Amino acid sequence: MELVLNDDQKLLKESAEKLVERYGGPDAHRKLRDVESGFDKGRLKTIAEAGWLSLMVPEKADGLGLGITDLALALEQAGRGLVTEPVAALAASARAVGTGRAATGAGTEQALNSLVSGKNILIPVLQDPTVPAAKRERIFAEHYHYGYQLTGTRTGIPFAEVADGFLVDANTSDGTILIIVPRDTFGITVDASRTVDGTAHGTIDFAEVTLMADELLIAGVKQGEKLAADIYIRIMLGVSAEMLGVMEQALDLAVGYMQTREQFGRPIGSFQALQHRAVNDHIQIELVRSLLYQVCNAVDGGHGSRAMVAAVKARASEAVLSVTKSVIQMHGAIGFTDEYDAGLYLRRAMTLASQYGNASEHRESFVRHSRLDAEKAAEPGKRRK
């Protein structure tokens, strides 16, 4: 599909381009590789001040009330500039807290303000509820006095070590709840490790973590699963938008190099084999762009599906690795050096492609959700679409 931006979206995209040009880029990324958090907290504050974290917070909770399409426009630029802050995850958490406040008054205004200002890092710890039982990482929440006691483990959570709190979907005897778990709560253990691009992820273990529900419960059993699914799909689309930006900038690097690097007395960009490779990479990028924004618009319109989102993440994860590897090959030996920028985009691609599930896992997810959608449509009394 052709993406037609309205005036507000054009301004948002231009603003994001300027922010990333000023605060992002390969040089800024290199400086962060030795930082424990893997990102710049000062830059996160700047991003928050630009309104990215409050984009999807409902207007009833004093947010901007915009959609994932708008956030994707900003995150596409973030991908171009190797901005590693977990914007998609934090913006999704802010939406969850804001939605809870708007619907039931759950949470506190102070907690939401701390989140959208970038002061509080609330990392989602969510999982697709349709994952096969053998791969499922359940977190159980037992009723305990006036709250809950959480037990379970989740692996591969981005920025788990530096989080101030976690947004957890937990299973109770009555259904799924969505609850905030402060990082310093007794019983939480985080085992962190670094990824190839210098950021971090970790395994979180909840061992009889006791919580009072008054201020921490975002959604009870009636809305918990639905809200958790909404947040999960928005994170998938946000990360896919970052991958789109990574691909675009990586290919731009290669095209620029081919126009200046000469062999046999002529630019290597004049060689048909490299032209064909660049065109194939461009086609992959445009396929991801079209699918991404089509699904973003569908989600914002209230008729998106989990199968569609899985298709986006699978396509983007596969394409970003293919394009960035191709870019390395188009550069030749210089592409392998740490001093050259192309390798930074490959490393970023490797991290984003595996976040929240790789291409293979999301293809499986697409099949599961497509089957579930078909079964639901075939139920008696359901009109086939």
Residue ranges and their predicted role:
Residues 66-67, 133-136, 159-163:
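Short glycine/proline-enriched turns and hinge-like loops at secondary-structure junctions
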Residues 1-82, 103-104, 114, 118, ...:
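Alpha-helical interface subdomain recognition
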Residues 151-188:
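A short core secondary-structure module
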Residues 111-113, 128-130, 138-140, 154-158, ...:
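A generic local secondary-structure boundary/capping motif
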Residues 136-139, 156-157, 182-220:
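Flexible, small-/acidic-enriched active-site or ligand-binding loops
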Residues 148, 166, 177, 200-205:
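Short beta-strand micro-motifs in enzyme catalytic cores
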Residues 117-129:
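A short, Trp-centered hydrophobic/proline-enriched beta-strand micro-motif
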Residues 83-106:
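N-terminal glycine-rich flavin-associated loop
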